[in-house]
């Protein structure tokens, strides 16, 4: 039976490069990763595949899963629910596959309450000036929105203490390599492997 995979929770401010670093990790790593598929109540768009792009559910089905405690984390955005289904994550982990969960800080804090032994990694910019330059460089937000994102980033960085690791994204390949090193080390953490080695030890004789 394969060892259980790691749940890797990956967060950071908007514009820090989470998606870019995550893609670099997937493309350059020899490890088997599964990018977590989210669940949503929004309408399925042309070309989207249920179970690949999202798990598409009705609002009633989603809310029932919430009541049953079957969502690792969830939020409502523009009238639709988005979240991470617990059953899907557990089934993947049980196959010995590491699950990569790229979510916002508030969602990560929800996950920490339910899966405290997950690996929590916070991706940081070198500094706030660099983060602002990246947001401006995307060319998708107004100056007002960028200012709001910077203020939000300050709040999120203040919550970094809730994470296990902080990785600076100064260069994408370097940041990806640092994350891979963290994941590799976590696979050898004593708390994760001790059960296997305890099985090798002789059992104490029963006291009469």
UniProtKB/Swiss-Prot annotation:
Its EC number is 2.7.4.8. Disulfide bonds: none annotated. It is an enzyme of class 2 (transferase). ATP binds at residues 12-19. Keywords: ATP-binding, Cytoplasm, Kinase, Nucleotide-binding, Transferase. InterPro entries: GK/Ca_channel_bsu (IPR008145), Guanylate_kin-like_dom (IPR008144), Guanylate_kinase (IPR017665), Guanylate_kinase_CS (IPR020590), P-loop_NTPase (IPR027417). It catalyses: GMP + ATP = GDP + ADP. One of its GO terms (molecular function) is guanylate kinase activity. It is found in: Cytoplasm. GO terms for cellular component: cytosol. It comes from the Bacteria. The keyword Transmembrane helix does not apply. Its main location: cytoplasm. Residues 5-184 form the Guanylate kinase-like domain. Belongs to the guanylate kinase family. Essential for recycling GMP and indirectly, cGMP. This is Guanylate kinase. It comes from Streptococcus pneumoniae serotype 4 (strain ATCC BAA-334 / TIGR4). The gene is gmk.
């Amino acid at each position: 039976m394969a060892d259980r995979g790691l749940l890797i929770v990956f967060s950071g401010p908007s514009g820090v490069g989470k998606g870019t670093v995550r893609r670099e990790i997937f493309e350059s790593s020899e490890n088997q990763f599964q990018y977590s598929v989210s669940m949503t109540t929004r309408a399925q768009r042309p070309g989207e595949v249920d179970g690949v792009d999202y798990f598409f559910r009705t609002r009633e089905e989603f809310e029932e899963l919430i009541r049953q405690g079957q969502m690792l984390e969830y939020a409502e955005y523009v009238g639709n629910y988005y979240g991470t289904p617990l059953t899907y994550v557990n089934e993947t982990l049980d196959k010995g596959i590491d699950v990569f969960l790229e979510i916002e800080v508030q969602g990560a804090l929800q996950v920490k309450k339910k899966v405290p032994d997950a690996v929590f990694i916070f991706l940081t910019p070198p500094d706030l000036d660099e983060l602002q330059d990246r947001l401006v460089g995307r060319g998708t937000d107004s100056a007002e929105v960028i200012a709001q994102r910077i203020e939000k980033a300050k709040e999120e960085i203040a919550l970094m203490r809730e994470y296990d690791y902080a990785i600076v994204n100064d260069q994408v390949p370097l940041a990806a390599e640092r994350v891979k090193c963290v994941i590799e080390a976590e696979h050898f953490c004593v708390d994760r492997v001790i059960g296997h080695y305890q099985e090798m030890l002789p059992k104490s004789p029963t006291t009469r």
